[in-house]
Amino acid sequence: TCPSLYDLRNLFQVNVEEGRHLWAMVYLLHAHFGRDGREEGEALLARRSGDADNPRILTAFNEKTPDWLSFFMFTFITDRDGKYQLAALAESGFDPLSRTCRFMLTEEAHHMFVGESGIARIIQRTCDAMKEHKTEDAARLRGLGVIDLPTLQKYLNFHYSVTSDLYGSEISSNAASFYANGLKGRFEETKLADDHRLHGSEYPYMEVTGDQIVVNHAPALTALNERLRDDWVTDVQAGVSRWNRIPEKAGIAFRFT
């Protein structure tokens, strides 16, 4: 069952639009890349999320979505990855790809709204129940028909982790090649105040050395994946901060991190 007809309509709209995004990419492959493009397009259409024999390439898109909380987290966090990947491709010098991605970005904005507002409603209802019944006990809150805040945090942790992997290796020669050849840009490339060639520039990234996380620097061209991930992290944090206003306003100490 769905929380409301409004949510059911949003679910249908998100699914229809994501299907349209798939077909848009298949069209580009068929229209501009000859026989190889047609074969890749057919392979895209053949893949199924979670299928044992022909799954999606990226792990995050094979994870199950068994409940509405998972759906809202997916649209808030994982569709936000889509925003940044599409924005980078919208900077492409290949005009058909650029125009297609710009159109898709308008639909991704709605998907993220569905996720953020859906989770916000859940948090609000939980905080209302906590205040009304003066309890933070998870079992009692679940008995009242709401989702306790620590469980929401666990869902947030999971979806954040699997989505973070979508950006690939922090240091990538492929990312450098795509950028140097004009296939892909950075998020809001035209707003960045540099030479847009990145020769001699560096970018910080974190890695594990021994038992510590240390900050290193790499050529900016090879660290483009990490830069895009950092942009995404900042945006996710902004949404989480908006969620945190709800328990803060209710006088509840819990904060999402």
Set out the residue ranges of the language-model regions:
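Amphipathic, well-ordered alpha-helical segments in soluble domains
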Residues: 21, 78-85, 111
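Carboxylate-rich helix-loop segments that flank metal/cofactor sites and access channels
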Residues: 33-70, 74, 134-139, 154-158, ...
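Short, glycine/acidic-rich hinge or "gate" loops at secondary-structure transitions
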Residues: 2, 7, 31-40, 122-131
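Conserved alpha-helical segments that form or flank metal/cofactor-binding pockets of metalloenzymes
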Residues: 15-45, 115-120
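Glycine- and acidic-residue-rich phosphate-binding/metal-coordinating active-site segment common to enzymes
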Residues: 92-156
